[in-house]
């Protein structure tokens, strides 16, 4: 993904309809835009060239910036100088309501209207980050995907679902047809956790004492991984000595028994939730797993209890056995989906 120059039309040229020339084409007709993947911890921004390729991707630590506007301003100044892209699509972590987002896992808020004014975009659109990944899923190269479980082919034009654990737990579906695809954003991570065995019943009891209501995200996320570790420590009657999810993951690599039990249980619960989502969406096109945590557990997902728990749906087990489960390993999947959304007729504020 080497950088390539991206141009925007001076506003005077836009008003007069006069296009500047560039290698035999008018800049007015060159397709350009800004795309972003704004999660709970990191903000990733990139440009999209006239061929739809991702250019100049940069990752920002959100804790170093007071707002999304500051991140975008920093990126554009360093990447384009005084030039500005015409359009923007930003994939954001949380529900977008009337063009506004209050981020679920940090203190930022943003709106299409504010970004439109601040950067003089011709149009700007906010979409859910997992909706962007759902748009990307059918387009991702095979070498950026890893099959988890049987090497199955998803049904053509059947719905698919993308889910994943990071700072939180995201979910979105993609409804497919010959007339095009439509993403369906959701907040499935805030659905209730459903235990599948006696140990998970006890996990639910412990976490409910702490949180009141225990959602999927209280377990299937970075912070949730540590919640799960602490609950299992209480069940086993041993001290929870590891400070956070990174310490749990590191301890598992050195053979710590409780840390390994935690990761195995995490993958099993992820399989159950993936199966529930496949049933909810009728996702015969496949379930795609993304997020910051799963790629670091790829071998454990492939060899552990994920797939068996995915298929363990009683009378629907035969149905589940035909649905492929795939790990997304593309580093910029949400940006690919945002770039796809950028190709649509202008939406959002314009």
Where are the regions a protein language model picked out?
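Active-site nucleophile and cofactor-binding loops and adjacent substrate-binding regions
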Residues: 61, 105-106, 125-132, 151-154, ...
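ATP-binding/phosphotransfer module of carbohydrate and carboxylate kinases, centering on a glycine-rich
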Residues: 7-9, 13, 22-80, 84, ...
